[in-house]
Amino acid sequence: MTVLAAERLRYRLGERLILDDVSFSVRPGDNIALLGANGAGKSTLLRILLGLLRPAAGQVTLAGQPLQQLSRRDIARQLAYVPQSHVPSFPFSVTHIVAQGRLPTTGLGHVADGADAESVERALVELGIGHLRHRPYTELSGGERQRVLIARAMVQRARLIILDEPVTGLDYGHQLRLLALLERLAAQGLSIVSSTHRPEHALACANRVLVLHEGRLLADGPPHAVITCDLLLRLYDVHVRQVEADGHCFFVPC
């Protein structure tokens, strides 16, 4: 079963071709790292997958239905999004922000109670932000806000979560905990697509990596098979060597 499919996507910005003939599908349990250098087209691709940009050619289907034919609410019931940054308009509490994840299902005016309230509480604890539940979102650090948005996505109960550079602003410990959480969610059958320019994040938790280079899909496969010294030289113009320890793969500068 395919959760989402991108079919021969092309996108132009003026005379510049940003994406060219990009095709792939997302299945239940996929934990996909979208890897590429700055300017490779990752953010543009995510915005097309979310229905925020219309491709010049090709289409995206969500559960077999063309994305452009679905309402924003229908999309939100199936797809959750965690942006790289979020500037709130009002000083809502952390609990209020997380509970907003239920809006696509419950609608406006619904107060989270019963099972919904339990979902919010579980997400707060899972992300290690239970102590922030009554704090205004506007007073949080960038890393704390990121964890709140991920908790909101979990509460949304969508089949697919798309994250734009999810470890941005997180300290080392919270980076590792977040990557482990994404791995657990995929093991439960959710689909994850997260963009990154850091190959170590793809190696740490993803079970599949899509490599985007100059607007084209360069590779699609298991991280340890796809990410090589030659690939990193092509993507980032750096010479590295591969080191293995305790069954894990690392790349260090030559």
Identify the role of each PLM range:
Residues L35-A37:
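The feature captures the beta-strand-to-loop junction immediately N-terminal to the Walker
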Residues L50:
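Helix-to-loop junction immediately C-terminal to a conserved catalytic motif
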Residues G58-P66, I75:
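Conserved ABC transporter NBD signature motif
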Residues A99, G114-L132:
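Conserved ABC ATPase "signature" region
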Residues P136-L140, E144:
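Conserved ABC ATPase signature
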Residues I161-E165:
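Catalytic Walker B motif of ABC-type/P-loop ATPase nucleotide-binding domains
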Residues L235-C254:
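ABC ATPase nucleotide-binding domains
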